[in-house]
Amino acid sequence: MAILAGKKVIAVGDRDGVPGPAIAECAKSAGAEVVFATTECFVUTAAGTMDLQNQARIKELAEELGGENIVVLLGAAEPDTASLAAETVTLGDPTFAGPLAGVSLGLKVYHILEPEIKAEIDPAVYEEQAAMMEMVLDVDALAAEVSKMRKEGSKY
């Protein structure tokens, strides 16, 4: 069963990883509708938390569109950053700094470089938008962290 086709995608990119617009292009090629795309600088934000405005926007979209219709795609460069972002959109903001503090959205979340997501993306688009980062990022560690949070916190 396809993960992305027909879904609403929230693309949360990382300045040092895969940027939001690149994630968006990949998602579109897999038949998803991108409803929000952003690129964060996780090392720039206080306490390493997800941007507070982005948390608010994700919360609004989940309420408006229904969590079951949304897939969050991350582009984080570091496994701990990916884990924090995945936890924020599943169980709630672990730093208790933003609108998702104590709010368990339970959204389905993946890293853009996870094999099951890569398999759904048009190979030419993936090559152009994301493949370069596979060579410099620890894909296995990123996938392990996001998968762990998905199993722990996703309701869908």
UniProtKB/Swiss-Prot annotation:
Keywords: Oxidoreductase, Selenocysteine
Superkingdom per UniProt: Bacteria
Keyword Acetylation: no
Reactions catalysed according to its record: acetyl phosphate + [thioredoxin]-disulfide + NH4(+) + H2O = [thioredoxin]-dithiol + glycine + phosphate + H(+); acetyl phosphate + methylamine + [thioredoxin]-disulfide + H2O = sarcosine + [thioredoxin]-dithiol + phosphate + H(+); acetyl phosphate + trimethylamine + [thioredoxin]-disulfide + H2O = glycine betaine + [thioredoxin]-dithiol + phosphate + H(+)
Protein EC: 1.21.4.2, 1.21.4.3, 1.21.4.4
Any one annotated GO CC term: glycine reductase complex
Listed InterPro entries: GRDA
Record HAMAP family: GRDA
Protein name (record): Glycine/sarcosine/betaine reductase complex component A
